[in-house]
Amino acid sequence: MPNTARWAVTLTLTATAVCGPLAGASLATPNAAASGLYAPSALVLTTGHGQSAATATPERAVTLNCAPTASGTHPAAVSACAELRATGGDFDALSARSDAMCTRQYDPVVVTVEGVWQGKRVAYERTFANECVKNSYGTTVFTF
């Protein structure tokens, strides 16, 4: 009987030593996956000359992905994402730079934004008086 008890204890300790780390890793996997979840923020920005998006032909388009990290074809993706985060994704809250000096020439430029910002659909359109005025708004968001 003492040998049987000794074997039982030895097998239990061996099984715990071998299987214990495996059980811990499998229990940690759901927490690791949960911390990697995020709301998507992926946008397509276009620009073209005209009064509205319906009449303007898109001349340039860029992509802007802000989650989990800033990326895309936007030339200043990191700073554009930072500006949008600061306004909570509100494009109307982007203000003009105070140091911009633009002429009063009227050559309308329309910018459109389509996509998803922090999990919510976005459809935005804004017409600027000219290219200089467009580039002065939002510092880098509309500069592409």
Swiss-Prot record:
Choose one Gene Ontology CC annotation of this protein and give it: extracellular region
Name its cellular compartments: Secreted
UniProtKB keywords: Disulfide bond, Protease inhibitor, Secreted, Serine protease inhibitor, Signal
Record family assignment: Belongs to the protease inhibitor I16 (SSI) family.
Q: Which domain of life is it from?
A: Bacteria
The leader peptide range reads 1-34
Oligomeric state and interaction partners are given as: Homodimer.
Cystine pairs: 66-81, 102-132
Q: What is this protein called?
A: Probable subtilase-type protease inhibitor
Where is it chiefly localized? Answer: secreted
List, alphabetically, the Pfam families matched.
SSI
The GO molecular function terms of this record are: serine-type endopeptidase inhibitor activity
InterPro entries of this UniProt entry?
Prot_inh_I16_SSI, Prot_inh_SSI_I16_CS, Subtilisin_inhibitor, Subtilisin_inhibitor-like_sf
- For the site Reactive bond, which positions are given? 104-105
What does this protein's UniProt record list under function?
Answer: Strong inhibitor of bacterial serine proteases such as subtilisin.
